[in-house]
From Swiss-Prot:
Belongs to the class-V pyridoxal-phosphate-dependent aminotransferase family. SerC subfamily. Pfam families: Aminotran_5 (PF00266). It comes from Mycobacterium tuberculosis (strain ATCC 25618 / H37Rv). This is Phosphoserine aminotransferase. Transmembrane segments: none annotated.
Amino acid sequence: MADQLTPHLEIPTAIKPRDGRFGSGPSKVRLEQLQTLTTTAAALFGTSHRQAPVKNLVGRVRSGLAELFSLPDGYEVILGNGGATAFWDAAAFGLIDKRSLHLTYGEFSAKFASAVSKNPFVGEPIIITSDPGSAPEPQTDPSVDVIAWAHNETSTGVAVAVRRPEGSDDALVVIDATSGAGGLPVDIAETDAYYFAPQKNFASDGGLWLAIMSPAALSRIEAIAATGRWVPDFLSLPIAVENSLKNQTYNTPAIATLALLAEQIDWLVGNGGLDWAVKRTADSSQRLYSWAQERPYTTPFVTDPGLRSQVVGTIDFVDDVDAGTVAKILRANGIVDTEPYRKLGRNQLRVAMFPAVEPDDVSALTECVDWVVERL
């Protein structure tokens, strides 16, 4: 509900989105996914994750992702518990041999670099930074064996294309695809570790990480393990690989997370795969950005159209329109999670446009914002 200082405005039902969830993660979960938890997936709850029924569910996730991303020969889907946050530490222990290079342009791309800088077994990373709303050009350095950036910076709505930098040679390209995977175009052959969590484009719950790994990445994991480098078992990539190839996780996974994820993957593949998903997010984002450019009180925060994300849109408001008040009124009317990333501190709304979000609902959201602003 809105607080006492927020005007009480009741948005007409006729212009509201059919579904008012626009959060950037956790994100909208489709009703059809939820229904499987009490139907086809119900028998899996409370059963061993080392037995065939749950292992088959993990296998369904792995094979579905292999189809969705058209994996080249030798690439494997690896998974483990803990979310992308855990994978940052796992990668610091298990993918970086000596030194890494990081592009940072927001909260989440910076967090991987921070995790690496604290790891005692690798050298101080090279960190190339740009201001929020922009991004550095992917590049390499002869001293590094990992090059890392985010496909989509969730905090700012900046998307950076995934291509191996020229001259990267044997350096692994490690991409944080947490809010990009499944909604942005990618050629997996341009990456060595394309990792993500399932609570964004894949409309599931958090607490799980998945990484699509190349033969080079798998070889690197083996080579580092052979040196005897210490790593906690929970963060051990060799253990994660060994278990994943058996369609299981090192420790007990959340069945609901896997079931929701599997349903969403099947839905994406069944509708036309990644090409279909990318066209859908492109449609949604075109509606949002066109609206923002046409209004006198809004503008896209990301000024370079080539960097604007199709899956997370950030829209700045002029000073005399308080975006925070707009977000509170929207929330009081059942249109939720349009607030900006808390640490960015801008007068803006942030809108997720993952595949589960209907493009028509994005249009309805913009109509609701217009209705609210006209009455402030």
